[in-house]
Amino acid sequence: MKKPFAYVTAVWQGGEFTVIDQATVYCRKVYEAGFTPLCPVLYLPHFLRDSVPAEHKDGIDIGREFLRRSRVLIVCGDEIDETVKNDIAMAQRLGITATTPVSYTHLRAHETRHDL
């Protein structure tokens, strides 16, 4: 069964491992909702160096291409920053549906209760 792409965005805060944990939880929930999650924060750092200006720009361009190919933009978390606002604005220009936020804290609490 072919699942539509869903671009996952959020305010990514904390250290590298915290961000990876947040993104992994969000992507799992998106997958369980019937989508194929596209989350640049989980993928791009494996081969791009954000400290190199050209690679930083390439990362932004790759992320935008992921969004263009997505059917839905999923905004996760409890906060909105400029990056998330830009993702929402681009999705609107492209006619891509954007969801309401999903709380990482709520998902972790639910996941913990569910696992018991």
Kindly give the residue locations of the regions a language model identified.
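Conserved small/polar residues in nucleotide/adenosyl-binding loops
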Residues: T105-T112
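Acidic/glycine-enriched connector segments
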Residues: T18-I96
